[in-house]
């Protein structure tokens, strides 16, 4: 590709205030276990759906999607990654298994012990690891704008540049257009919302495990929710997951979207998630 430029028990859940109001009420709670605390934004009532954000970004990215899912009859849970907001815990010498444990604790305490896990970009790795490690808690897995098994290294460079606050806006916008936003979609919405201080920790957690430990996403039904113009999963890799895992995989492709997907086409994401989840047993 051409480069653009050179185990301990769950201890408690604590009410922690009220966030922006929605029809079903948006609220914040804290899930605590061992030396970890996870801040969770919750809204809606119904079957639980957990939304996990992209690398070095917050679950706030899902605001519109969460509101849409809540209106569609779901209990939407958005755990903030360690190091963001009031989510705390070890940031070094951790693996993807530890981050998956955070999500499992949220599902057990706030999701009635069973949930659909949606992971966007980096979050899809956490979602798959959660499903592999804690299959009884996972009703289904959605990998949204998930990268192919192998992708061009300059895309990783672009992701780093997009969230590098020391670079000029022009440099960051170039990276956002290259790796994240389809032509005609506004990349400026992602000039903010980055937490570069957690990026290395998150990447190290993935690097500490073998890809085959999480790649399958367990055995639950899996939705491969793709963006039509995502360079991390070009059209030639469209059926990669289904070819490997067969009928448990459903492929849906959202047009006019790239790797960012969530801010690009929130309504289409809500519609796709709702349609697929409502067909689950």
Question: Which residue stretches match the model-derived regions?
Answer:
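Active-site loop/oxyanion-hole signature of alpha/beta-hydrolase fold enzymes
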Residues: 71, 78-118
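A short loop-to-beta-strand scaffold at the N-terminal edge of the catalytic core in hydrolase folds
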Residues: 33-42
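Catalytic active-site module of serine/aspartate enzymes centered on a nucleophile-bearing elbow/loop
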Residues: 248-281
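Catalytic nucleophile serine of serine hydrolases
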Residues: 121
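Conserved serine/cysteine hydrolase catalytic core
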Residues: 204-244, 253
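Conserved HGGG/HGGXW glycine-rich cap/lid loop of the alpha/beta-hydrolase fold
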Residues: 41-86
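Conserved alpha/beta-hydrolase catalytic His-Asp/Glu region
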Residues: 152-153, 157, 164-218
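Flexible "cap/lid" loop of the alpha/beta hydrolase fold
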Residues: 125-132, 140-167
């Amino acid at each position: 590709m051409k480069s653009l430029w050179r185990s301990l028990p769950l201890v408690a859940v604590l009410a922690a205030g009220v966030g922006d109001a929605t029809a079903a009420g948006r609220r914040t709670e804290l899930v605590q276990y061992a030396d970890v605390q996870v801040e969770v934004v919750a809204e809606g009532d119904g079957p639980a759906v957990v939304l996990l954000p992209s690398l070095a970004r917050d679950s706030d990215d899902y605001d519109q999607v969460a509101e849409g899912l809540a209106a569609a009859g779901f209990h939407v849970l958005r755990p903030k990654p360690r190091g963001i907001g009031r989510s705390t815990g070890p940031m070094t010498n951790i693996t993807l298994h530890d981050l998956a444990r955070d999500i499992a604790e949220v599902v057990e305490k706030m999701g009635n012990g069973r949930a659909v896990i949606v992971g966007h970009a980096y979050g899809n790795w956490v979602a798959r690891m959660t499903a592999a490690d804690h299959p009884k808690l996972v009703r289904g897995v959605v990998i949204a704008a998930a990268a192919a098994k192998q992708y061009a290294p300059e895309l990783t460079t672009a992701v780093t540049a997009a969230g590098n606050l020391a670079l000029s806006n022009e440099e960051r916008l170039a990276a956002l257009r290259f790796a994240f936003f389809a032509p005609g979609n506004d990349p400026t919405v992602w000039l903010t919302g980055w937490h570069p201080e957690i990026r290395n920790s998150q990447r190290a957690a993935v690097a500490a495990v073998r890809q085959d430990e999480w790649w399958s996403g367990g055995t639950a039904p899996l939705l491969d929710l793709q963006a039509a113009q995502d360079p991390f999963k070009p059209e030639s890799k469209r059926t990669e997951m289904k070819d490997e895992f067969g009928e448990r995989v459903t492929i849906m492709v959202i047009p006019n979207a790239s790797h960012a997907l969530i801010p690009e086409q929130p309504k289409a994401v809500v519609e796709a998630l709702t349609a697929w989840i409502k067909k689950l047993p």
